Amino acid sequence: MSMKESLRKHFSMERFRKIWWKMLLLGLGLASVYLAAYFVAGYHIDFSSITDTIQEQANINLGNILLIGAYIIVLNSLLEEFFWRGFIYDKMRVQFPGWITHAITGLAFSLHHIVFYYSWFSLPIVAAITLGLAGYAIIMNLLFEKTELFSCWLVHAIVDIAQIGIALMVFT
């Protein structure tokens, strides 16, 4: 299937218009989980060392985090959903039973993100984040099965807004 055919197949604005408010609520619910985890676990984490590392290695700081955040929220979330749900998951679900596809893509999605946080936290926290991301990916797979990529994109973008909000709190 060509990219154009894949885009046409997975992006249904007609369907999205009917359910966008449900996706907004789901996104807010998942974002609340991220925020709750931050407020609960945040007391046990030295965020100053993380911000120092991010500033040194990636040149991300309070001055440019909004621009980087806008990229992550709008474009990166779209690219990730198209790749992980619209391509990888869509191809795998045809060839493997559902639970195998969910497990593999959930784990792969979380490991794809581990490069960003493995050096910031202790092993138990890295494991918890990785399992949480795998669970999130499975939720997104199930959402993709029932809806289309616009819905996945909106939910992902809302979760990313929460993450950028956390980053702003950490940097200030």
Briefly describe each language-model feature range.
Residues 1-3, 34, 38, 42, ...:
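Structural signal for membrane-spanning alpha-helices in multi-pass inner-membrane proteins
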Residues 123-172:
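Functionally important transmembrane alpha-helices
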Residues 1-2, 62, 66-70, 130-135, ...:
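Membrane-embedded alpha-helical segments of multi-pass membrane proteins
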Residues 1-9, 143-146:
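Structural signal for the C-terminal ends of transmembrane alpha-helices
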Residues 8-76, 94:
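Juxtamembrane helix-loop-helix connectors linking adjacent transmembrane helices
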